[in-house]
A protein has these predicted regions:
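Flavin-dependent oxidoreductase catalytic core characteristic
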Residues: 1-125
Length: 125
């Protein structure tokens, strides 16, 4: 999966967040956890899009961006999957995570760490 392939999945998550926001009533007493999770999901989504934009300017960020974006997508999807109906979602609407697993594997993370040791942290603008 390259960076432009992440975009449709991030768009799918954005749609799920918006659908969940429309479904919930906004009652802090009854839906505090869900609203909290949605606010962090929205922040994580923005961070993922920001790092992908950074890769366009600095390809040295590609490997860390792949890990970060895969982790964001997986984390948000898992939160939705545990209580999909609470968020007004169906399990079939959630992203398929299989294509992201290589970026989250111990081998990928280890290679990323080794790259940091060998080359230092990639500089960004």
């Amino acid at each position: 999966m390259n960076n432009c392939q992440f975009t449709p999945v991030l768009d799918q998550i954005d749609t799920l967040i918006r659908k969940s926001c429309a479904f919930l009533q906004g009652d802090l007493d009854q839906e505090q956890i869900e609203l909290y999770n949605l606010s962090f999901a929205q922040a994580d989504l923005l961070a993922a899009r920001t790092i992908l934009a950074g890769v366009e300017k600095n390809p040295n960020l590609t490997h860390i961006a792949n890990y970060f974006v895969a982790d964001v997508i997986t984390s948000i999807t898992q939160k939705f999957a545990v209580r999909a109906k609470t968020y007004g979602l169906e399990a079939a609407e959630l992203p398929n995570l299989e294509s992201l697993q290589d970026f989250l594997s111990p081998e990928y993370v280890s290679a990323l760490g080794q790259q940091f040791l060998d080359d230092g942290l990639p500089e960004s603008d």
